[in-house]
Amino acid sequence: MKRVVAAGTFDILHPGHYEFLKFAKSLGDELIVIVARDKTVEKIKGRKPIIPEEQRRAMVEALKPVDKAILGSLNNKLEPIIELKPDIIVLGPDQRTFDEEELKRELKKYDLSPKIVRFNKYIKCPFHSSYDIVKEILKRYGGKE
């Protein structure tokens, strides 16, 4: 059985997230998704996610391609990958915490050598990113309750 792992913030789900996860699932039999912790997102992006981590995890796990969604580690971002021992890791188009080669080198230290695949497709549709959704909400409802 081929285990695939994908990770992300998944703050305000949109079609791009779904296409990313559908692609990831197509590469194997089991898809486990690591959802970034609120504190991790705040450290990387300089702001907390809009949707709390447990709600984001539950929403991701409810998606058809996803077999299981877990929260990432607060200590070591590689910890869940080390525990899961995936055959394939799928990176999203905007994931830059690691590049493919750096990730391979880091995982080699733990005797892991999964195939690393980058999903480079941006979905061309209205509201294809969380940022675009937030901008539209502010435009439509900015200052209004």
Curated annotation (Swiss-Prot):
Keyword annotations from UniProtKB, A to Z: ATP-binding, FAD, Flavoprotein, FMN, Nucleotide-binding, Nucleotidyltransferase, Transferase
Cross-referenced SUPFAM superfamilies: Nucleotidylyl transferase
Q: Which residues bind ATP?
A: 9-10, 14-17, 94, 122
- Gene3D superfamilies, per the entry: HUPs (3.40.50.620)
GO MF terms listed in the record are: ATP binding; FMN adenylyltransferase activity
Q: In which pathway does it act?
A: Cofactor biosynthesis; FAD biosynthesis; FAD from FMN: step 1/1
Quickly give the catalysed reaction. Answer: FMN + ATP + H(+) = FAD + diphosphate
Task: Give any single GO term for biological process.
Answer: FMN metabolic process
Cofactor requirement = a divalent metal cation
Q: Does the keyword Lipid biosynthesis apply?
A: no
Where do the TM regions start and end?
A: none
Please give one Pfam family short name.
CTP_transf_like
HAMAP family of this UniProt entry? Answer: FAD_synth_arch (MF_02115)
List the NCBIfam families hit by this protein, alphabetically: cyt_tran_rel
Q: What does this protein do?
A: Catalyzes the transfer of the AMP portion of ATP to flavin mononucleotide (FMN) to produce flavin adenine dinucleotide (FAD) coenzyme.
Q: How does it assemble?
A: Homodimer.
Q: Which family does it belong to?
A: Belongs to the archaeal FAD synthase family.
Name of the protein: FAD synthase
Q: Which organism is it from?
A: Methanocaldococcus infernus (strain DSM 11812 / JCM 15783 / ME)
